[in-house]
A protein has these predicted regions:
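A domain-level signal for the structural core that forms small-molecule/cofactor-binding pockets
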Residues: 1-223
Length: 223
């Protein structure tokens, strides 16, 4: 098997090589403006190679639009300064049960084909004395989703970040998402979705895990 075949198999199997986002040591040396300028040049070259007429009104602004979108939006989670503040509060009311934030929208990008991953995340924890503001869980999901990603890694990163912030292992996350690299190319299966889960601490107990899953299944639509 040659190197190209190995790379194709790795990409089509959606394998994560590590729970850490693979970044070079010099990843943050360029400014946002410098990155946008560099990416714009490469996008322009790609479209030119594909035979597109970049003088057309519809296309002439595309290289810059794509570059800005990459740096400021869909890959904005690569920038450390975008990481949300993870301040916690004392659990002064001594709430001792599970807290679950479910149906958090996930918009990410498959790092193997740079196509969208779209789905929902369900995140829960059991307080050991500290609590997070509810919106913080949504922001954690968004931050780690906004980068080239693998769903398994994303699931683990969300759990690990919450464990660090809360000082407890008792955190869980389930993500159910569609991968356009499966839906729109390759096998072209438009119906399948991928489910990943990471359970820490008390969530490894089958009864606690069952309770978490029951909360997720509750119908809480209000419109």
């Amino acid at each position: 098997m040659n190197k190209n075949q190995e790379e194709d198999i790795l990409g089509d199997n959606h394998i994560a090589t590590s729970a850490v986002t693979p970044l070079r040591a010099d990843a943050f040396q360029m400014s946002e403006t410098e990155k946008i300028t560099e990416i714009e040049t490469h996008v322009r070259a790609i479209l030119h190679t594909l035979g597109m007429d970049l003088t057309d009104d519809s296309l002439k602004g595309t290289p810059k639009r794509v570059a800005k979108m990459f740096v400021k939006e869909i890959f904005g989670g690569l920038l450390p300064e975008r990481k949300p503040s993870m301040s916690t509060f004392d659990n002064s009311y001594h709430y001792g049960e599970m807290l679950v934030e479910k149906n958090i929208v996930v918009y990410s990008t498959c790092e193997h084909h740079l196509l969208p991953i779209v789905g929902r995340a369900h995140v829960g924890y059991i307080s050991n004395g500290k609590v997070l503001g509810l919106s913080k869980m949504n922001r954690i999901v968004e931050y780690y989703a906004k980068r080239p990603q693998v769903q398994e890694r994303l699931t683990m990163q969300i759990v690990q970040e919450m464990q660090r912030a809360l000082g407890t292992e008792d955190v869980a996350c389930i993500i159910d998402a569609k991968h356009l690299c499966v839906n729109s190319r390759g096998i072209e299966d438009i119906d399948s979705s991928t489910v990943t889960a990471e359970f820490g601490g008390k969530f490894k107990d089958p009864e606690v895990r069952k309770e978490f899953l029951e909360y997720i299944k509750l119908d809480t639509r209000f419109h």
